[in-house]
């Protein structure tokens, strides 16, 4: 009887590890197909600013080495006689160029721009998706790069989706005085809660115990537990002013996360709810509303 029960237990453990590894490979391996993750259809023609970066001739390729010795890539776009900098941080499965519209706007406002490729994305090295946790340390290195070049720099961070998760996780670190303000657009509370939501909505699967096993895999392979990648915990230590933005029809990073993030934030803060807009569409669909609020919020600090 004992042998039978032990065998059943072992089979269940193996099945759970298999499911968890499949989840890890699907969600956190940057090289695996992400087909089916984003189901929203966008039939809108791209605006000039959405593709502007591809034709911009004066962008400079720059590289840093991460704390774990990955070669990370970014673009710098200079503006003469300006100490203002915007670091635009892209989302899950994207790359630096996907922040073209943000870069275009800030550049038109007289900012220098740094557009990093997050680890495992674009031209940056990396074999896993950091969900913002290790990425936060990478952004700190990018901040240092700017300050070394311009000690009087005033730096703004603006992230979308996973990029928003990243800049919120940056907010809980000891930041140099040069970092003045943060904009987060449709970010999540934590990697664990986000994946639990996606498991439920996409696959009709429970988070327990699948995410526990998946988190063990991320620790073994990538050196972080999913529970560590928490914007909530980092926001509780934040000192830099933060603007929170979320579309109320977001079905990928659920809208209810906005208030959880906002309430957790210990620094000066404001929020913008964008009506009838889905995931990561606030800027493109309600551009005037979006930028009026952003410019109003950042003005006292930049």
Model segments located where?
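An N-terminal hydrophobic leader/cap segment in hydrolases
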Residues: 4-65
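The serine-hydrolase catalytic nucleophile loop
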Residues: 92-105
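Short alpha-helix in the alpha/beta-hydrolase fold that links the catalytic acid
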Residues: 102, 231, 240, 254-263
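Conserved alpha/beta-hydrolase
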Residues: 106-125
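Alpha/beta-hydrolase active-site loop
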Residues: 129-150
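Hydrolase active-site cap/lid region
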Residues: 169-224
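Short beta-strand/loop motif that positions the catalytic acidic residue
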Residues: 237-239, 244-246, 250
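Catalytic active-site module of serine/aspartate enzymes centered on a nucleophile-bearing elbow/loop
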Residues: 285-302
